[in-house]
């Protein structure tokens, strides 16, 4: 199978979200693809370095390594440098991908329910998520909730469209 590694900045929320995806992929497509998740709890550039080291030290022959981080309050040059490092270290054998959310993964979660611009403070995301989740009968939002992918999956098309819309108004801006 083709091996993929997802290395996240977060140690709770992001790994829990991606672990649900990992279970689906590894169970459904085990002959074609295998996905591993690592929550590292590090900043942008250091996270890339850890992801690269894990990929090359692993007995798995990773073809794709996904470096996932929030922009938080990191300087834009760190966010852009991580993306550049991914591009510069990609070869015909391994492809590095930088994926970030602005400012945190909870914005991605919110985009499943409506269009939000990133100019609302991240402290407002949790109450809004709880409101939406209660409305659909899924209870309160908690930071390391292990079922978020399953809860959000039916709304994925909405989230993708809202993310594209948000991206389009931010073209050319630093993250």
Predicted region positions:
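C-terminal accessory helical subdomains adjacent to catalytic cores in phosphodiester-
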Residues: 1-3, 15, 19-38, 45, ...
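Short hydrophobic beta-strand that contains or immediately precedes a catalytic carboxylate
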Residues: 5-9
């Amino acid at each position: 199978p083709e091996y993929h590694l997802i290395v996240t900045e977060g140690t709770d929320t992001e790994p829990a979200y991606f672990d649900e995806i990992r279970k689906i992929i590894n169970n459904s497509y085990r002959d074609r693809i295998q996905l591993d998740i690592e929550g590292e709890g590090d900043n942008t550039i250091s996270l890339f370095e850890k992801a690269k080291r894990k990929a090359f030290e692993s007995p798995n022959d990773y073809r794709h390594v996904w470096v996932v981080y929030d922009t938080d309050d990191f300087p834009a040059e760190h966010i852009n440098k991580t993306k550049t490092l991914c591009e510069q270290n990609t070869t015909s054998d391994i492809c590095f991908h930088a994926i970030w959310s602005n400012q945190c993964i909870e914005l991605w979660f919110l985009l499943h329910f409506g269009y939000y611009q990133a100019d609302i403070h991240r402290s407002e995301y949790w109450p809004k998520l709880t409101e939406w989740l209660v409305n659909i009968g899924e209870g309160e939002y908690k930071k390391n909730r292990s079922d978020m992918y399953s809860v959000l999956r039916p709304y994925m098309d909405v989230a993708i469209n809202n993310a594209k819309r948000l991206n389009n108004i931010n073209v050319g801006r630093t993250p």
